[in-house]
Swiss-Prot record:
Keywords: ATP-binding, Cytoplasm, Fatty acid biosynthesis, Fatty acid metabolism, Lipid biosynthesis, Lipid metabolism, Nucleotide-binding, Transferase. It comes from Pelodictyon phaeoclathratiforme (strain DSM 5477 / BU-1). Pfam families: ACCA. PANTHER family: ACETYL-COENZYME A CARBOXYLASE CARBOXYL TRANSFERASE SUBUNIT ALPHA, ACETYL-COENZYME A CARBOXYLASE CARBOXYL TRANSFERASE SUBUNIT ALPHA, CHLOROPLASTIC. The lineage of its organism: Bacteria, Pseudomonadati, Chlorobiota, Chlorobiia, Chlorobiales. Pathway: Lipid metabolism; malonyl-CoA biosynthesis; malonyl-CoA from acetyl-CoA: step 1/1. Acetyl-CoA carboxylase is a heterohexamer composed of biotin carboxyl carrier protein (AccB), biotin carboxylase (AccC) and two subunits each of ACCase subunit alpha (AccA) and ACCase subunit beta (AccD). This is Acetyl-coenzyme A carboxylase carboxyl transferase subunit alpha. Residues 48-308 form the CoA carboxyltransferase C-terminal domain. The gene is accA. Component of the acetyl coenzyme A carboxylase (ACC) complex. First, biotin carboxylase catalyzes the carboxylation of biotin on its carrier protein (BCCP) and then the CO(2) group is transferred by the carboxyltransferase to acetyl-CoA to form malonyl-CoA. Transmembrane segments: none annotated.
């Protein structure tokens, strides 16, 4: 059985839940010698503690700091791209390789079908995303979700294939950044990401980008140019991680909380700044507490966005996408 990961700010809740489990176990193990009044009292105590646990849970997750949301975005049990693909789509056909160098396992992609049974909506899509591992072995295989140049070139190849067959593109972003190794730099990481930005802006099919966990720097935006930019409630998206920002500004990682506040990297921050278009609500406690519900919510929103984008003609899609990204940010011009 996997060990439950408890974040620092979750410890008071974890302790109360452990106490509640003990009381429930005590009730299950109670013998017939226990009087009805004692059983009733224990039931009452359990109900009281359940209310306290629920209130504490809602209080904690309603008032998360930016750094705490970064921690939730990195939770090892959080659903990854493959989890969402399996929960949201059917008939997934993975496609491999960049046709230049190799197949980067940190980015996966392929054709799939997303459906809505209530309305009969059924749409083939190209779905592409970063993929992390669940343990040391799989993380080494996936390079901890840090894509190399061939990963971004593979992603672009799949997007252009989708364009050829007139299928919309969905990207799922979850990376601590592009791989910073010397070999990756020699193979052209910067060029690969820049080429993706240029080509994604011109794709003549709908493109929806979703930050499902970490969205760090060029590694994230390398598959992040779209008609709609969505963010999971407890994800983050920034030019730099809080730890790296702290090490640059204060020469130490211990100021990561202050860095997270200064970076304004949460979904709420970015929605208010016009960087993203929509926040995807998560179950209380984070996406990992109920992946099925999280995937169902994301699927519903994706279908809604697809229905809005599919009727648009290619020229309109490209024009609006370029205008969208051109209008981001604030700057001053000299008179």
């Amino acid at each position: 059985m996997a060990t439950k990961v408890v974040l620092d700010f979750e410890k008071p809740l974890f302790e109360l839940e452990a106490k509640l489990d003990e009381m429930r176990q005590c009730l299950r193990n109670s013998t017939r010698e226990q009087s009805p009044s004692e059983t009733e009292m224990l039931n009452h105590d359990i109900e009281t503690l359940e209310l306290k646990v629920d209130a504490l849970r809602r209080s904690i997750y309603k008032n998360l700091t930016r750094w705490q949301k970064v921690q939730l975005a990195r939770h090892p049990a959080r659903p990854y791209t493959l989890d969402y693909i399996h929960l949201m789509t059917r008939d997934f056909l993975e496609l491999a390789g960049d046709r230049r160098y190799s197949d980067d396992k940190a980015i996966i992609g392929g054709f799939a079908r997303i459906e809505e049974s209530a309305t009969g909506f059924s749409q083939p899509v190209m779905i592409i995303g970063h993929q992390k591992g669940r343990d040391t072995k799989s993380n080494l295989y996936r390079n901890f979700g840090m894509a190399q140049p061939e990963g971004y070139r593979k992603a672009l190849r799949l997007m252009q294939l989708a364009e050829k067959f007139r299928k919309p593109v969905i990207t799922l972003i979850d990376t601590p950044g592009a791989f910073p190794g010397i070999e990756a730099e020699e193979r052209g990481t910067a060029e690969a990401i820049a080429r993706n930005l240029y080509e994604m802006a011109k794709l003549t099919v709908p493109v929806i980008c979703v930050i499902i966990g970490e969205g760090a720097s060029g590694g994230a935006i390398g598959i992040g140019v779209g008609d709609r930019i969505l963010m999971a409630e407890n994800s983050w998206y920034s030019v730099i991680s809080p730890e790296s920002c702290s090490s640059i500004l204060w020469r130490s990682w211990k100021y990561k909380e202050q860095a997270a506040e200064a970076l304004q990297l949460t979904a709420v921050d970015l929605l208010s700044q016009g960087i993203i278009d929509r926040i995807i609500p998560e179950p209380v406690g984070g996406a990992h507490t109920d992946p099925d519900v999280m995937a169902a919510t994301l699927k519903e929103i994706l279908i809604e966005e697809l229905k809005a984008l599919l009727p648009k003609d290619p020229a309109t899609l490209v024009h609006e996408r370029i205008e969208k990204f051109s209008s981001m940010g604030v700057w001053n011009e000299e008179e």
